Structures are given as C-alpha cells and as structure tokens.
C-alpha cells in the first residue's frame, strides 16, 4: 500500500527492457501505448504539464520511446492562473543521456516521471501548435473544455489512491468527500463506475463511436486493446503462462487471479464476518448474504437473485435452452454442473465418499444430503405445523398439504399430484411399464420402493423395529400400522356406518360390504374378488407360485399363513389350548 510521500510513475507504469521492446509486435505496442495514454490522461489533471512540441517532433520520426525522457515544471501565478512551461528541444535531446532524472512533485504530494512515447497523442487532443508556454485557467469561471472531458479520469486517480489522499494536508475536505462518495459518473444516464477507463468506454457507447471492428464476427469495440483481447477468442491465443503449473490464459488479469491459487493469497476480506476471498467479485457476491440484496430480476416471472449467474441459469427454464451436450449419449443440459454430474454415469466414477459408512456418491450435494442420516439433522421446518425435514424438497412437498396445491397434472386422466414423483409413478399405470426387476426371481415392479420392499423377502431383512414390543418389519408403513395396536388409534372411519379402523386398507375392504362391489377379476377363470389381496392369493392356484419357503426343511407354500402353521412342526409350538 502506497502511503504519503512520493509515488514514482514507474510504480504504475508498464516497463519493458530494451531487448523485450524490440520483440513486441505492432498489436502489443499499440496495447502498451493505450495503457500509457490512459495513465498520462490521469496525471495531466493532477497538475502534470506537457513538454515542448519540438520533443513531439522527435517522436514523429519513430524514435525509440525508451530513450526519450523529459522534465516538466509547474509554476503558480498569484492571479490564480497556472502556467504550464515546456522545455526546448536541445535540453530534451540531452535528457536521454543524463543520469539524474528529475521528478516533479505536485500539490498532492505525488511525483511522476513522464515517458514521452505517447505525448504526441495528448498534443493532438489539446489542439496545441507552435507554442512553448500555454496558460490553463484554474478558476471556476474559466474551466477548460478538456478538463470537463477528463474530470472523470481525475476522479479515478483520486479514487484509486484514496488512502493516500484522505489524510493529505494538501487536499480540501470537499475533494476528500468526493473521493469517498462519488466515483466516475456518466452524464448520459447517471451510471457510476469505479474506473475512469470504463466510464470513457461507456461514453463511447452513447456517441455510437466504436472505431475498432473485429473482422471475424463484426463486433465493435471502443478501443484497440479490447479488440486485441477479443480476437484471442477466435485465434485461441493464450500468451500468458503460469510458471507454477503451466496453465495458459488469454488475459494477464486472469493469470494474476489464477496465481492466487498457488500463493494462497486472499486479499479481499468481508468486514461483517471476516471471511476472505481471492477475488473482489466473490466478496461482492458474499456481501449480499449479509445485506439480503437480490439485484438480478427475471423479466419473465419476476423472481429475484443475488447473483447474475443464478439469474442466467434460471432464465434457461423459460427459454428451454440446453447448451451443454453429452458427447457420449447426446443428452443436453441447461447447466454445466448438470452435464458434469451426468458424465459420471458413463465413467462410473463416484468421487464423494461418506466417512461414516463408506457409501460413495457422484455429487457432493447427494453426499451432504446422505450425511444427515448419520447426524440426524433436520434443518427444514414447516412454519405451519412445526414439522421438520431432512431435505428441502420434502418440506416443499409437505407444505402443499397445507395449501392444497397440486401442480403436477396427468395429461391422460387429469389427476393432479402434490409432487413430481407422485405423477411419475402414476403415469406408469397408463403405460403399463414396470421398469424395476428383481434379480432373484425376475418379478417386475412399477416403483423402485416396491422392488426394495420385495427384495427383503429374499434377504430376510427387517430394518423397522417397534420400540414397544421389539417386533421387526420389512416396511416402515407396516411398522406404522402395527404401532396403532399399542396406541389404540383408529383414524379411518366408514361414512356409512361410522365404524373405525386402524388401517386404510381395512376401511377400503369394509366399504365393499356396503357397495357389494367385487372389482378384482381373475383373468384365468373369471372369478371376482372384493380385495386385491384375495385375487393375488387365488392366482397362485393357476401359476403354481409358492413364494413362502421354510428355512428349516425347504418346503414351499402359497400363503404366509400356511408357512406359519407349518413352522410350528419344527418349533413344537401349540398355541391353541
């Protein structure tokens, strides 16, 4: 950080050794000139004067800019006018061999050494010809037009070194306030910029003067340096190389940002929580967490976001754009993260591993969601009833119970559902598809949960245990039904006779007594049944299926009750007295 004292121009200038300057191509020299021009513009309005025009004539002969230096002097007149004096050609030509380069200290306490390679451009802008002494009025009534044009540039210099100027005894208090509060502002629409060069580029947009045009795509730019950077997109040129890892970049600013990965430097600190960041843009995004600001609004639906990237991602929902395509199967995605996660399907790679149980996942979000099983964390709470959930989508689906919202509608029959999974499961009824197949017995199922429950018949797994009596169950729903035996709860009531039941299936079975309905028909013999369970048991007569096997002797049975009766032969149990 530069503090009060002398600031040499070399501290802000771009320096090239003699041999490197000769290696620069015309485009690179043009870029160098434009950067130096911007710096000179900033210095002029801090009180730095211009040299004699005879020195400029030397530049017209394309002399090496590295060998041209000049000393400029400033003098204040009592009448409130500032006289700018140049030096003659003879003294200027001798400066290249002088060892002592004198510097100028202006009223802000800064000293600068001028490089003259770009001063010809300044003279053209000021329309000065044939004079060695130019007077510039500094009183309010006689402000020069050039000073008006570049007032924003002066603000940039003051803003850039605000820490040096804030405590400077030479700077008026009102000017300090301007430094702190008013960055460069556009006179057309009032938009503010932190950097004067961006303001200048913005003003070129208003004048429709974009003189630099790309021959590849016809895009126009306000200055040649932007055009040079843009053309690297077409050429693929990446001239800036990281010496640590060899990675290449097309902009030096990107290289500087990348190098912080190796150095670990995080110069941007949040004053609210102390968190540090490698990029200023990351700090700005983070700061909105504290302020709650969401400046990016979707024009389609009005939804607001705290990051422009989030808005861009959201807008693809409306446009249907899916620019990220898998080269393996052709599937397209709206976001790069979606494609990255999808590619794992082809590679089989699972990068994220749970330290508790060793289970691996192909997405970090899935691992985070899984780890809540071990921690028991349920961070999402319903404001209506206080119920908590492990996942946000579960809370969203639950909340629709209170609102009655059913946004997912079947196009075949018009039935609506609270969540997408309910609609997806329902659609299989119309298609007849049963995509989930048991590897043990080849039985197929419409839902993955049904397959998981079925597979426990083969494994014997009963993960759900009753805390009251210790009985185990293969399904959580069976445990919930069983638990009502202990509580005596019977939440299902018949509207005809007001009889109550502990199970919804028992109520459905009971209702058929009133309706006389037998809606389940055997396709083999035409026999009808009032319950689906009865039909399934009956169908085993035709298929010969015996899914219940005794582990003691290997005998098979068509019904679970028959297996239970048989098992008593081995145990010797005689429950009926």
From Swiss-Prot:
GO biological process, one term: regulation of transcription by RNA polymerase II
Domain KRAB positions: 7-78
GO cellular component, as recorded: nucleus
SMART domains xref list: KRAB, ZnF_C2H2
Keyword set, alphabetical order: Metal-binding, Repeat, Zinc, Zinc-finger
C2H2-type ZnF: 184-206, 212-234, 240-262, 268-290, 296-318, 324-346, 352-374, 380-402, 408-430, 436-458, 464-486, 492-514, 520-542, 548-570
Record-linked InterPro entries: KRAB, KRAB_dom_sf, Znf_C2H2_sf, Znf_C2H2_type
Transmembrane portions of the chain: none
Pfam families with a match to the protein in the record: KRAB (PF01352), zf-C2H2 (PF00096)
Coiled coil: none
PROSITE patterns to which the protein is assigned, alphabetical: KRAB (PS50805), ZINC_FINGER_C2H2_1 (PS00028), ZINC_FINGER_C2H2_2 (PS50157)
One Gene Ontology molecular-function label: RNA polymerase II cis-regulatory region sequence-specific DNA binding
Protein name per the record: Zinc finger protein 880
Species the sequence originates in: Homo sapiens
């Amino acid at each position: 950080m530069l503090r009060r004292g002398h600031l040499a121009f070399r501290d802000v200038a771009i320096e090239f050794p003699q041999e490197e300057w000769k290696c620069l191509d015309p485009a690179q020299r043009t870029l160098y000139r434009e950067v130096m021009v911007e710096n000179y513009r900033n210095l002029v309005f801090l009180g730095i004067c211009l040299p004699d025009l005879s020195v400029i004539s030397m530049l017209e002969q394309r002399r090496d800019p590295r060998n041209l230096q000049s000393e400029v002097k400033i003098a204040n007149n009592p009448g409130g006018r500032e006289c700018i004096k140049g030096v003659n050609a003879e003294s200027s030509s001798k400066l290249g061999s002088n060892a002592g380069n004198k510097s100028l200290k202006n009223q802000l306490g800064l000293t600068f050494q001028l490089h003259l390679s770009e001063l010809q451009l300044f003279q053209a802008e000021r329309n000065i010809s044939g004079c060695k002494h130019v007077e510039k009025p500094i009183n309010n009534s006689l402000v020069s037009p050039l000073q008006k044009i570049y007032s924003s540039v002066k603000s940039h210099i003051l803003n850039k070194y605000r820490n040096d100027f804030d405590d400077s005894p030479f700077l008026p208090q009102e000017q300090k306030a301007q430094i702190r509060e008013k960055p460069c502002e556009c006179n057309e629409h009032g938009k503010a910029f932190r950097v004067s060069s961006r303001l200048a580029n913005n003003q070129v947009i208003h004048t429709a003067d974009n003189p630099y045009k790309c021959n590849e795509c016809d895009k126009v730019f306000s200055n040649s340096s932007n055009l040079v950077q843009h053309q690297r997109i077409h050429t693929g040129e990446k001239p800036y190389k990281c010496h640590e890892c060899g990675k290449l970049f097309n902009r030096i600013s990107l290289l500087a940002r990348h190098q912080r990965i190796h150095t670990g430097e995080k110069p941007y600190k949040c004053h609210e929580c102390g968190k540090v960041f490698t990029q200023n843009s990351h700090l700005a995004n983070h700061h909105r967490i504290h302020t709650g600001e969401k400046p990016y609004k979707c024009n389609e639906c009005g939804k607001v976001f705290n990051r422009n990237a989030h808005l861009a991602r959201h807008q693809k929902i409306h446009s249907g754009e899916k620019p990220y395509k898998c080269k393996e199967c052709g599937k397209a995605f709206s976001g790069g993260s979606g494609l990255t996660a999808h590619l794992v399907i082809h590679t089989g790679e699972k990068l994220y591993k749970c330290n508790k149980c060793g289970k691996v996942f192909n997405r970090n979000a899935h691992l985070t969601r899984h780890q809540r099983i071990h921690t028991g964390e349920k961070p999402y709470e319903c404001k209506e009833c206080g119920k908590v959930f492990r996942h946000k989508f579960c809370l969203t689906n639950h909340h629709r119970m209170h609102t009655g919202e059913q946004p997912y509608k079947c196009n075949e029959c018009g039935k609506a559902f609270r969540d997408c999974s309910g609609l997806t499961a329902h659609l299989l009824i119309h298609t007849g598809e049963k995509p989930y197949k048991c590897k043990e017995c080849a039985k197929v199922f419409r839902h993955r949960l049904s397959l998981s429950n079925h597979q426990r018949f083969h494994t014997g797994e009963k993960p759900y245990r009753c805390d009251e009596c210790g009985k185990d169950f293969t399904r959580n729903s069976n445990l919930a039904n069983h638990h009502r035996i202990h509580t005596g709860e019977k939440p299902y009531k018949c509207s005809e006779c007001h009889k109550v039941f502990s199970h919804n299936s028992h109520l459905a079975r009971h209702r058929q007594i009133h309706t006389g309905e037998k809606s389940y028909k055997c396709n083999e013999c035409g026999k009808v049944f009032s319950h689906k369970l009865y039909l399934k048991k009956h169908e085993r007569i035709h298929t010969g299926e015996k899914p219940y096997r005794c582990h003691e002797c290997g005998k098979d049975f068509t019904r679970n009750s028959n297996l239970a009766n048989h098992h008593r032969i081995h145990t010797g149990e005689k429950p009926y007295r």
